[in-house]
């Protein structure tokens, strides 16, 4: 697999596109006025303790307070507890890199928030989940510092080695190195890329991360109030950090500062970036040149056509995402069950692709086309799970419910691309629908009757949108005339293009 990272930086908006074998698989959009707070480390102040919820609200410098659970304040926790804390939010599975457990598990103990949190206390926190919708950022006091080859855990005693490292000898070598780090009082997770380098290089990174941690502590101790202590790695560099060099074919940027940042990053690890890093200065916009812009435009569409002629409908709500699978134009050449299975398998591949591309997370419910054969159901599940393995975020698939629905959970850390690229429609206030002309017309009829009965009006004026006036005077002219005759009134109508389709006024004399 060849991976390309294409970065478009334009006056306050940075867009990062990840292409695998020239196909867009991820898009990340950041706006300078909003900022990207995921993994940032802050000096925070506890503003409100909620014993009933075993949690607290923390002011940390964001636009609203963050949320921290008692277990994220607790001292001397095990790695298992740390993982459970990450997994506990919204009943979603954690999306961290797979790694083996090298320490013994301990039962999770009950934690009393009042033992660790007092209003006004200043604490060092890290954002583990960005604000999404009405929810504030999720915070923890258990800081993790990620590098290219390892993750340093300053507050947790743990050695972990990525499960993706299969070489037994290499695993033993990395665990032995981890023991040395553990003796210094730090936990460590050796990442997948650690298998591709030597211990000396990993040791250099560990020394760098320990120095960073000491600097963070010193800055926190000297400071007062809320403040950003340590910004997270630029998302652009984060993607570089998580990509093996033999898989990264190129990183193309259209901003000189971004080019310097990438070159400096490679230089730190002693790697020559000349054949990987490219500065784009052609007249065409960079996303147009790489055929990314048309794909970005499609991201907000609900309907996705499958190659066979079937289609998906993706509906994102506050609570969950619903995906409906339909055969559409596809009629197949065999029996109905074969047609359905083929459409469902094709849909499974496309669903996994769009969960990652659109960054849809939390609870996802899929309504596949009904299948009678259990073997066919297992085939579709297997296809879905296989395709989801390509996703860096942790996904869990649950078998068909009694209603024939598939449930998926995908770890959420940032908002979806639909949320990043769109805003609620100002015309319908985000409902996606407005009252029909017919409904508004009959509302006007009722309002006219009310005016006559309450105020004794005999001459009235109705102001409304032109389409509503058309419905009054044309489509329902008979009913309108009957109403005027019955009430013995005269009604003047006035069209106003500036009015909302649902708005109208009735005034009487």
Name the predicted role of every residue range.
Residues 22, 156-158, 220-223, 331-332:
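Gly-rich Lys/Arg/Thr-decorated short loops/hinges at beta-loop-alpha junctions or inter-strand turns
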């Amino acid at each position: 697999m060849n991976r390309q990272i294409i970065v478009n930086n334009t006056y306050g908006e940075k867009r990062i596109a990840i292409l695998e074998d020239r196909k867009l698989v991820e898009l990340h959009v950041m706006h300078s006025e909003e900022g990207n707070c995921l993994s940032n480390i802050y000096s925070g102040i506890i503003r409100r303790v909620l014993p009933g919820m075993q949690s607290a609200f923390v002011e940390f410098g964001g636009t609203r307070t963050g949320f921290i659970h008692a277990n994220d304040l607790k001292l001397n926790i095990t790695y298992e507890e740390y993982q459970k804390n990450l997994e506990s939010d919204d009943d979603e599975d954690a999306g961290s890199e797979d790694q083996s457990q090298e320490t013994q598990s301990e039962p999770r103990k009950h934690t009393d928030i009042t033992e660790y949190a007092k209003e006004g206390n200043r604490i060092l926190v890290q954002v583990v989940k960005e604000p999404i919708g009405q929810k504030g950022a999720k915070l923890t006091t258990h800081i993790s510092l990620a590098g290219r080859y390892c993750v340093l855990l300053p507050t947790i005693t743990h050695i972990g080695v990525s499960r993706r490292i299969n070489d037994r000898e290499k695993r033993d070598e990395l665990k032995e190195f981890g023991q040395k780090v553990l003796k210094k009082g730090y936990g460590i997770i050796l990442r997948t890329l650690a298998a591709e380098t030597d211990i000396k290089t990993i040791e250099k990174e560990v020394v760098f991360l320990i120095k960073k941690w000491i600097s963070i502590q010193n800055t926190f101790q000297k400071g007062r109030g809320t403040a950003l202590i340590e910004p997270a790695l630029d998302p652009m560099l984060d993607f570089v950090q998580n990509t093996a060099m033999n898989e990264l074919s190129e990183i193309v940027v259209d901003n000189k500062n971004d080019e310097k940042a990438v070159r400096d990053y490679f230089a730190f690890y002693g790697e020559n970036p000349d054949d990987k890093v490219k500065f784009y200065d052609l007249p065409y916009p960079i996303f147009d040149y790489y055929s990314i812009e048309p794909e970005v435009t499609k991201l907000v569409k609900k309907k996705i056509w499958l190659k066979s002629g079937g289609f998906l409908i993706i509906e994102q709500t506050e609570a969950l995402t619903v995906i409906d699978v339909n055969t559409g134009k596809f009629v197949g050449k065999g029996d109905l069950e074969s047609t359905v299975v083929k459409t469902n398998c094709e849909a499974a591949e496309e669903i996994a692709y769009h969960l990652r591309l659109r960054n849809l997370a939390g609870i996802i419910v899929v309504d596949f086309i009904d299948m009678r054969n259990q073997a066919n159901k297992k085939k579709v599940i297997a296809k879905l799970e296989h395709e989801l393995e390509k996703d860096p975020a942790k996904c869990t698939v649950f078998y068909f419910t009694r209603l024939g629905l598939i449930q998926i959970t995908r770890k959420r850390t940032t908002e979806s691309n639909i949320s990043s690229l769109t805003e609620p429609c100002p015309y319908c206030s985000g409902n996606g629908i407005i009252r029909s002309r017919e409904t508004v017309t009959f509302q006007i009829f009722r309002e006219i009757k009310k005016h006559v009965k309450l105020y004794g009006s005999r001459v009235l004026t109705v102001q409304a949108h032109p389409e509503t006036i058309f419905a009054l005077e044309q489509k329902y002219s008979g009913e309108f005339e009957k109403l005027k005759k019955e009430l013995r009134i005269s009604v003047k109508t006035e069209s106003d293009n500036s009015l909302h389709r649902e708005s109208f006024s009735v005034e009487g004399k």
